[in-house]
Amino acid sequence: MTFRLSRFESPLIEDDGESRASLLGYSPENELYTDVDENRESRFRRFMSFISSSPYDMFLAINEHVESIDWDSKASTIAGPLGNFFTCSLYTARLLQDSLIRPNQQKLDKKRDSFDLSRSEILRKFEYLSQVPKSGVVVTHLNWYWKFLTFLNVALQITVGFLILINLFVAYKFLIGHFQVYSLFYTKTSPRSKNVTKRSLSDLSFKSLEEVTNSSLWTMIRYMFVRKRLIIKDAPKGKYYYQLRKWTPGKFYTALFSAFSPISVIFLLVTEVSFKTALAVIGHQYILFLVLFKRYESRLDDEACLAKAHFEEINEKVIKPKTTIKTQDAMVDATTYGGGAAFFPSFTTTRSHIFQTHAVTGDIITERYNPETRNFEDVENTGRAKNYISQIQGVSHGQQVVSRSKAMNGATARPQFFSRQPSPSKIGTPSIILNYRTSPFSAPTTPTLKPVNGVQNGQSIFRNSPDPSKANSLNCDTSHLSRNNTLSRLRRNSVSPTKSGNYCSASGMRAIHKSNFGADSSVSYSMEAPSNELPFEEVARRGRHPFEITASRDLPAGRSSAVSSRHSSISPFKGNTSFAGRESLDSRPPFR
């Protein structure tokens, strides 16, 4: 085991005192005595203080030593044989009393020299007394036997009394001595138990307990024996709680009580003990030990195993998935340029196995516990951000490629699309057949207007596509998708305010479609048109790249209304008329 002096120094605690003293800057020369003298004096002082201490301190020290022993583990090895020894001792004592002491009880109690005529001085004067044969040898021979029986009688009485006291102590510790009190604060209904009482919440206040302890002796006795057994029946809702007083005897006293029970003691005391009585005592010992210790304690152990298994199942299925969620502190880029997210390690989880401590020098040390090696390991670079989504070098923010299924902390991130180009499909979900990147530009403008003639028009449409390889691959006729079709979904929901008039009547360019509802003059979504007038064909050729400054001089004169219409129309289904074979992947709703 080590202790941290600094971030880079962690000496072992098992080292000698001189190395630790040198590291801490401690010099024993400043002390008045060495460690050896201190140990010698401490032993002497400890012995003197133990002798001169009060009896209560000695009792407390002995009690602490006794309570520190794990008695439950010694139930089968000590308690059972000890109880059987006590029962056998009581049976032997009662057998000797009934078979040896009781028949000679009269001889033991009376005086043996009461009728000894040889001691009388008056009878010694007569000659007749000298003719009577003397039996002094027989009396002397039996004298030690009566004395032994008298001593044995006293010893057996003391033994029986001592065994009765031990049995009373064991019965008290088993039946009354072990109880645990539980407070059921979240139980709404009364439990079906005789050991449950209804208590007031005012009894839990420190003030009430302090008042009881500082009051008279009679008040404390009344509180202990009267108030604690008071059952509150009509307490208001939320002002009471239930208290359970559970009987919890240990395995040691259970084994000792079953092997040396009060039933066998009472049976041996009230009956005349003989050799036949041993059969009843042995049978009683076996049955009681089997019922109480073997079956009853085994049942409690089995219930504990089932409760543990049930708790482990709940822990694995419910508690652990909710409390061990891997979390991180994230910093997400919320700008319109796209970008990524920076993730920082989070130390707020309850099961992160990461601890922050301070060394002797004041350095902050971050350690992580490794269950495999059972050691603490230093965690480096804990404050450095870890970018799981980073930008590709040489690609701008708008053209940043974002993973479609990036997994972050177990969740899959949805694909990001930087284009606001509306999808021509009825549903707004991305298509699964598109394998090219979306447009990096975001503007609430109408997609490219498609002329109906020429391959150049098809090429101008694919200038809107973010994939340049598609620009020269169109060699199909798209004249069947004319905008004269009023039932086409490409013109549905169009609310452009500039489509109600004949602003474009050139043949082959764009057909006039008069709205059935009249001009949408109440709501205007138009944007400012560019200062320079561009021809409509040039606008159609450029597509969504208005930053090009090279314009063809061979095209007919443009109309500013067409440019304004391009910038003001916000129809959600007017873009990408050539959707044969491909669809847009824009999953965002149309701009309205």
Curated annotation (Swiss-Prot):
GO terms for cellular component: nuclear membrane. It is found in: Nucleus membrane. The keyword Ribosomal protein does not apply. Its main location: nucleus. The chain crosses the membrane at residues 151-171, 255-275. Residues 547-592 are annotated as: Disordered. InterPro entries: Nur1/Mug154. The keyword Cytoplasm does not apply. Keywords: Membrane, Nucleus, Transmembrane, Transmembrane helix. It is a multi-pass membrane protein. Member of a perinuclear network that controls recombination at multiple loci to maintain genome stability. Required for rDNA repeat stability. Belongs to the NUR1 family. This is Nuclear rim protein 1. It comes from Lachancea thermotolerans (strain ATCC 56472 / CBS 6340 / NRRL Y-8284). The gene is NUR1.
